[in-house]
Amino acid sequence: MKPPIFPPLTAPLPALDWHARARMYRDQALGMPDIVNGQPNWPRYFLLAHAVELAIRSVLVHAKTAGERAAGQEPGNHDLTALYAYACNLGLKSNLKVLDELQYLSEIHKNHVARYPKSLGQVWVASEFDDAVDALLSDTWQHIRVV
C-alpha cells in the first residue's frame, strides 16, 4: 500500500490547521475577477464561502479541543450565519461588518448556487464580501491563536 500523498493532520493544535486551510482558500480568491463572460465568477464565491466556513469551524475545533461547549446543537454545514452565531456563543467576538454581509454569502453557500446552476434573485459582486471575509479571518485567528 502506498503512503498517502499528504500526511494526516496530527498537529497538537488542530484549530490552526483548519484556519490555515481557510487562508489557503481565501488566498486563491484574491485577484480573481468578479465577472467572467458576463456571469458572476462562481468559483470565487465558493472559495470565499468555504474560507469563511473553515475559519468559523476553526473556532469550533478550538472550543472542542479545550473542552468547551455552547448551548444548543451545532448548526448543519453551509449555514454560515448560524455557524457564526454558534461560534460567537463559544466566545468569538462578534463583528458588525461580518454580521452585515455574512447573511448574503451564507445564502449563496447554503443553496449551493456557486456550485450548481440555479436561479437566485439578486447576487452581489463577490468583491463586496472581501472586507468581511478578511475581518472574519482576523477575528477567528485572534480567537484561536496561542499566546
PLM feature spans:
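Long, charged low-complexity segments
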Residues: 1-20, 26, 64-147
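Short N-terminal helix-initiation segments at or just after the protein's N-terminus
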Residues: 20-21, 58
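Helix-loop segments that flank and shape redox-cofactor active sites
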Residues: 27-43
